[in-house]
Amino acid sequence: MIGTDPRTILKDLLPETIPPPELDDMTLWQIVINILSEPPKRKKRKDINTIEDAVKLLQECKKIIVLTGAGVSVSCGIPDFRSRDGIYARLAVDFPDLPDPQAMFDIEYFRKDPRPFFKFAKEIYPGQFQPSLCHKFIALSDKEGKLLRNYTQNIDTLEQVAGIQRIIQCHGSFATASCLICKYKVDCEAVRGDIFNQVVPRCPRCPADEPLAIMKPEIVFFGENLPEQFHRAMKYDKDEVDLLIVIGSSLKVRPVALIPSSIPHEVPQILINREPLPHLHFDVELLGDCDVIINELCHRLGGEYAKLCCNPVKLSEITEKPPRTQKELVHLSELPPTPLHISEDSSSPERTVPQDSSVIATLVDQTIKNKVDDLEVSEPKSCVEEKSQEVQTYRNVESINVENPDFKAVGSSTGDKNERTSVAETVRKCWPNRLAKEQISKRLDGNQYLFVPPNRYIFHGAEVYSDSEDDALSSSSCGSNSDSGTCQSPSLEEPLEDESEIEEFYNGLEDDADRPECAGGSGADGGDQEAVNEAIAMKQELTDVNCTPDKSEHY
């Protein structure tokens, strides 16, 4: 392959894709390798759709793989990473030289300064938390001989506390620690005292003057390979599994994210998670708080599973999306109307850009103020902070320069019709509609879940949003007559796109050394082309292209 131009290969793989000229050959080769090594995408089975199908599978299957992530430990009280007062924020205060929060998981930074990591370690160290209902459900499946393997991305060791025996800790855990120099290994209890006293634990066997003789918990850091145990187990399990259940994971961290595409495609797959995973095709999607969903499944399974239930009430199913409450409708009516302009060549109203940018800023600020004020009165602080961050996005409209030639109002004498709707104008047109979004699950009463045919269920806690016309007032929507589709936000069936998926595509380019042997396969389909198209467009905007597991996945 020496002397071969990777652009030639990319042209053959993706004929309609033209990589930007500024991408170097190394990056292009990484894209080629990523495409060729990606397992083919699985298609949903048409004969498995309902929660009844899921329960039947749980009753009949004997070799179940359960893949778990952050969602199974949310209810255990483990500290949050990203909130205003979370671990990341406090580390930034205590360690101002920390370049970014995730640097504490970088092995090179750890060698230079292990203190940030050990401050974090104290907060989630084993022995402080109890297993969730999800952990207990998996442990009972293990006890009954139904569990083939639990692959967890978490590092909290709660699987062991729950009694799960057939466990693979994909990203390591705090259960043991080993010396960076001599690899001497000890149990977590041997270094507990030092960690809770905020003393960097030292190796008892290495010379005292050896600066790197540090007892590091055996967590997979950036720059380290996954445990060999993961690869060996996956090589065997992929041919034995008869059901895959994903619980509480976004599946954006490779190689674990490749598991659903690496097992035989006829094996049924069930998702239990707060949000959908649009890059994968599950047969049944149970969306919401993981413990709430597992509680309902335990009711339906009966026997020993019913004894695990935290909530004695079995939920009732509804098939019609609940309407907005009167309070929500009143709030929506307070959104400012989008200015309209009747163009000379169209009978339908077209929204235009106010000619004074101060008008935009005023409208946005007023709406933001109303939105935040309402949140502060009606919702807990954590919810206010989360939604305020979303609302803050729309302050960026203030920076739009309406006199910029790239930003043309409808009716402008310059530019053709296709240039009238610029990116900035699209943002302006859509911001009221985005403000109007809210979680469908918040409309459910305490004993309901919503069935969205053919295979999606919305439980409490589901991060699935609605913006359909029957939910929003006409003054706050983008309109239904647009042919361009630029204003159409994702509907109930289409969750908001997460740019981290694009980032994860690039993260995955460099992690081939960590890819399990079972993740073979070749070929590029439409999904590959779309991913590459988006990825190369975002390349210059990405600042972190680490390839090893993202520890924030645990939270």
From Swiss-Prot:
Residue positions, PTM N6-acetyllysine: K46, K185, K238, K321, K417
Residues where Zn(2+) binds: C179, C182, C203, C206
Matching Gene3D superfamilies: SIR2/SIRT2 'Small Domain, TPP-binding domain
Residues modified as Phosphoserine: S343, S466, S468, S552
This protein's record includes keyword Coiled coil: no
Post-translational modification as stated in the protein's UniProt record: Methylated on multiple lysine residues; methylation is enhanced after DNA damage and is dispensable for deacetylase activity toward p53/TP53. Phosphorylated. Phosphorylated by STK4/MST1, resulting in inhibition of SIRT1-mediated p53/TP53 deacetylation. Phosphorylation by MAPK8/JNK1 at Thr-338 leads to increased nuclear localization and enzymatic activity. Phosphorylation at Thr-338 by DYRK1A and DYRK3 activates deacetylase activity and promotes cell survival. Phosphorylated by CaMK2, leading to increased p53/TP53 and NF-kappa-B p65/RELA deacetylation activity.
Sequence motif Nuclear export signal, location on chain: 241-247
Record region (Required for interaction with the sumoylated form of CCAR2): 64-67
Enzyme Commission number, as recorded: 2.3.1.286, 2.3.1.-
Family: Belongs to the sirtuin family. Class I subfamily.
This protein's name: NAD-dependent protein deacetylase sirtuin-1
Organism: Rattus norvegicus
